[in-house]
């Protein structure tokens, strides 16, 4: 397997791949077309040297350094007016890493790629046997490989089906040497087709689109998110996506649960894989809670009404008893006045009789006169 030739074929098939299948994204002159050595020197020129070799980085750190270089390039080339109008280029979140791949270093991934490429290269050399012995092909080093080719072979991104077919058709074209990074205008870098920039302009500029792992093509029926996402120096477009959850294809090396916790999430999901399910269940819970609150309020209102009615009844009874008490007191006073006015003489006569006859009248009683004769 000729790794260098594979990277050149990708660049040679850019113009032809733009016209077939899904809308490809412009990446001509982007960070991804640089080799590791050129990228290292570019970081040093931007003042963003990490002080650390790429081989000792893990894949998460490599992607973060690529995003940092893109942001630095966009900020250095954008004018103040364009930055105020367009908001600037934000860090791309279209690349996700499987969890098993994010913890590996670049050297470990490169050794795995070399082991995978060795049997294929040996079979290709043996299949072309004949009278003359072929010269052994020199395998490219890590520093000579472009970032895009490394990410594609490592399984981080995968090429579009239409772009791959166009790349095979344009394999006879002369290779294009890597160019220096031109100034990028923020006015032409955007997310989605918002203005007058269309996919035809990106195709005329020699654009090739590639999408991250787990983003399905429209021709595949795996219920993945349909659309493409890429990073380029000319234009960036993102097609509308379907947020239904599905399993990744074979290039994703697993389902969505293996995504790196440190990698940015490219698209929002309406559902969740683990934990509580959202949607109808949440609406039912909220509705039950609202009904319970309404019932509690009605019960409290009824209790307050009963208490108020009982209090008013007690107050009315107390008022009635007070009125009856006042009437009885008035009657008692009237009776006392009548006794003082109408019975004073009777009382005097009774006193005089008691003085004159201290013993009172003689009491009558039965006396025994005779006894029976016997």
Swiss-Prot record:
Induction: By abscisic acid (ABA). Residues 1-13 have a biased composition (Basic and acidic residues). InterPro entries: bZIP (IPR004827), BZIP46-like (IPR043452), bZIP_sf (IPR046347). The keyword Glycoprotein does not apply. Residues 14-23 have a biased composition (Low complexity). Residues 1-23, 117-142 are annotated as: Disordered. Keywords: Abscisic acid signaling pathway, Activator, DNA-binding, Nucleus, Transcription, Transcription regulation. GO terms for cellular component: nucleus. It comes from the Eukaryota. The keyword Acetylation does not apply. Expressed in roots, leaves and embryos. GO terms for molecular function: DNA-binding transcription factor activity; transcription cis-regulatory region binding. Its main location: nucleus. Residues 286-349 form the bZIP domain. CDD domains: bZIP_plant_BZIP46 (cd14707). Interacts with VP1 (via N-terminus). Belongs to the bZIP family. Transcription activator that mediates abscisic acid (ABA) signaling. Binds specifically to the ABA-responsive element (ABRE) of the EMP1 and RAB16A gene promoters. This is bZIP transcription factor TRAB1. The lineage of its organism: Eukaryota, Viridiplantae, Streptophyta, Embryophyta, Tracheophyta.
